[in-house]
Curated annotation (Swiss-Prot):
GO terms for biological process: asparagine biosynthetic process. Its EC number is 3.-.-.-. It comes from Penicillium rubens (strain ATCC 28089 / DSM 1075 / NRRL 1951 / Wisconsin 54-1255) (Penicillium chrysogenum). Belongs to the asparagine synthetase family. This is Amidase chyE. It comes from the Eukaryota. The keyword Transmembrane helix does not apply. Residues 250-639 form the Asparagine synthetase domain.
């Protein structure tokens, strides 16, 4: 786990080598400063290489191969191919054996296989990488830069062009060192296309999308292409497997995904909440240890050596799960550390969580995650295993129920409701999803947009989360609805699959996995926040060997109707797969969204923080937010404990933090 920064100069065809060298020498100083801005990500080592028009920089958090041979950048034996890598690659030992005769490995770092695979497979090598990763590779012979990001966007990777230089980095803040002067992109803010597309809400700043790679050459425009995407079966096809066969298939793949993530030359711990996702991971780790699997660098494989960390919110906050987590830990016989998170602790971390996540999320769970990582770091632990990604793949959100019921599940007809009952249940679920977890819904979505989405019920929930009270002048940028931007952000192949081939539940899962998960959840409850305290998070539920199997599980086995209870059981197939590893309490517990506290009173620590940030001057310094509407939201949030008002208030406050720390000038109207 590390931080990377890179540049590729576009000197112009008329530039001499001398001019190019002079430009590069200046940019190298900027590269070093860009590494300073993400220095928290890699305190163990630092390195860079610069050759004419290219520079690659790296700060390292040592996890595997703690020796100097694991330091980066990496190079091939001809010194013509160079790479900087952030993340963990879990099949590195297999590929080392396979490629030992044709590549001279220097050390035992997992990330060293990137160059070896590139030399063996060419550009197709990215598909052979298994894990959480982002990297930049430079092939001097071909004058080719390649930057890529893992399949689900666990690691962040951004790019932009500043003063004739292509810049690529783990975090946007690194671009400030190269002279980036951020400006708000009002169009992407209004239509919220930044939630799905490569474009961010900063003009000219793009993300490498999950499952994509970027290629560029000197004096040529960069180009982004996909190397992987989620696939689902045809909704009319029948699944001939038995339920038990599918249960065993999920269990086998999840166990393997957990097991390979226990390897490290440093201590490894578990993030444990009160839900089935992290509890099943903890249960599997404990079971693997009993069978002799090492947990990180632990010498004794006994569960009592395993450490779990849990946020403990105030008991009356409605968000505390520590009592359940404690019971799970006691049942497993493992150590548990409760990290107390009261309102004062939450408010004190508000601005730092926004700055490091570089994204506004209308919730406060990122501050709890920041406190967790602080506690893990204080214990000398560098790696944690987490539960992110389960809800999206096993249908854990209540909002999925309406889409499950939108059409019969022809792949698993044995579980079908009678048609009359299905229609009644659909009407109720469709009504509930309007006022679901985020409380955002639009009745004005055009019919054409609805058809492109095959009338998915989760669209507004995803597209409008954290919507802003925009100033009236921003309509000059158009009135595209977020729902339209969401579906038009996908290519024609995906839209065709949605309208013709995929079951609506799979469409809903695709939408969540491509938007809310990588751009919100994994930024606020993942790498960006954990690495503030030099903690690497690993996500077994996002192992593509597992998810490609789960994506082919019939919808009715993910969200199963239980006729004897006249209710639905979310994540049914996961519950059955992990039943041997969790308590009866966890097996039977209903899904509860992992969110921070949602009710705060006037005069409290958070209210004081909001009053400090959300002033008339600060709101007007954004340029695109209406002050009167913001005042109204703040009033509702704290005097009426209105959840919509709180979400809107938090979102505005987070944009204010980003604007101030990035030095963004106020947005203005389009010129006449």
């Amino acid at each position: 786990m590390c931080g990377i920064s890179a540049f590729l100069c576009h000197p112009g065809k008329a530039s001499s080598n001398e001019q190019a060298n002079a430009q590069t020498r200046h940019v190298v100083d900027e590269l070093e400063h860009s590494l300073d801005l993400v220095g928290h990500r890699g305190p163990d080592a630092r390195g860079h290489i610069d050759i004419l028009t290219i520079g690659l920089g790296h700060v390292r958090l040592s996890i595997i191969d703690l020796s100097l041979s694991g330091n980066q950048p990496f190079h091939d034996q001809d010194n013509s191919i160079h790479a900087v890598v952030n993340g963990e690659l879990y099949d590195h030992e297999y590929y080392r054996d396979q490629l030992a005769s044709e590549f001279q490995f220097v050390g035992t770092s997992d990330c060293e296989i990137v160059i070896a695979l590139y030399k063996h497979y060419g550009l197709s090598f990215i598909s052979h990488l298994r894990g959480e990763f982002a990297f930049v590779l430079w092939d001097a012979n071909r004058q080719l830069l390649i930057a890529a990001r893992d399949r689900y966007g666990i690691k962040s990777l951004y790019y932009t062009v500043v003063q004739g230089k292509l810049l690529v980095a783990t975090e946007i803040k690194s671009f400030l060192a190269f002279g980036l002067q951020p400006e708000w992109c009002v169009r992407t803010l209004r239509d919220q296309s930044w939630r799905i597309e490569s474009r961010t809400f900063f003009k000219g700043v793009h993300r490498v999308l999950p499952g994509h790679y970027l290629i560029s050459r000197p004096n040529e425009r960069e180009e982004q292409k996909p190397y992987w995407d989620l696939e689902y079966p045809d909704k009319l096809s029948h699944d001939a497997r038995s339920e038990e066969e599918i249960v065993q298939g999920v269990r086998k793949r999840l166990l393997e995904a957990v097991k390979i993530r226990l390897k490290a030359d440093v201590p490894v711990a578990i993030y444990l909440s009160g839900g089935i996702d992290s509890s099943s991971v903890a249960g599997m780790v404990a079971d693997l240890m009993r069978q002799g699997t090492k947990l990180g660098n632990e010498s004794n494989s006994v569960p009592s050596n395993m450490k779990c960390f849990t946020v403990q919110f105030d008991e009356d906050s409605g968000a505390d799960e520590s009592a359940i987590a404690r019971r799970t830990a006691n049942w497993l016989g493992v150590d548990i550390h409760l990290v107390k998170m009261d309102e004062e602790a939450l408010a004190s971390r508000f601005e730092d969580a926004v700055w490091h996540s570089e994204i506004p999320l209308p919730d406060l769970n990122g501050m709890g995650r920041l406190a967790l990582a602080e506690a893990v770091h204080a214990q000398g632990i560098k790696v944690v295993i987490t539960g992110e990604g389960s809800d999206e793949h096993f249908a854990g959100y209540d909002a999925f129920r309406a889409d499950l019921l939108s059409e019969p599940d022809h792949s698993w007809p044995a579980l079908q409701l009678p048609e009359t009952d299905r229609q009644k249940a659909l009407a109720m679920a469709a009504k509930q999803v309007k006022y679901g977890i985020f409380g955002e819904y639009s009745e004005t979505v055009p019919d054409a947009t609805k058809r492109m989405l095959n009338h998915s019920h989760v669209t507004s929930t995803i597209a409008r989360v954290g919507s802003l009270p925009f100033s009236n002048w921003t309509t000059s940028y158009g009135n595209d609805l977020p729902e339209t931007s969401l579906i038009e952000g996908f290519d024609g192949r995906v839209r065709d699959n949605i309208t013709k081939r995929w079951h609506p539940l799979h469409t809903a899962q695709y939408l969540f996995t491509k938007s809310f998960m990588p751009h919100f959840i994994l930024r606020y409850n993942g790498d960006n926040i954990d690495m503030v305290n030099q903690v690497e998070s690993r996500c077994p539920f996002l192992d593509h060997h597992l998810t490609e199997y789960v994506n082919n599980v019939p919808p009715s086995l993910k969200l199963k109707y239980l006729p004897e209870e006249k209710s639905f059981r979310e994540k049914y197939i996961l519950r059955e797969a992990v039943k041997p590893y969790v308590t009866d309490e966890i097996y039977n517990i209903s899904k509860k969204a992992y969110m921070g506290p949602r009710k705060f009173w006037p005069g409290g620590p958070l209210h004081r923080k909001i009053k400090q940030l959300v002033t008339k001057e600060n709101v007007e310094s954004l340029g695109f937010v209406d002050w009167n509407a913001t005042q109204e939201a703040v009033e509702k949030a704290f005097t009426k404990q209105d959840p919509m008002g709180l979400r809107r208030t938090i979102t505005v406050a987070q944009f204010i933090v980003l604007g101030k720390r990035f030095g963004v000038k106020p947005a203005g109207a389009l010129p006449n």
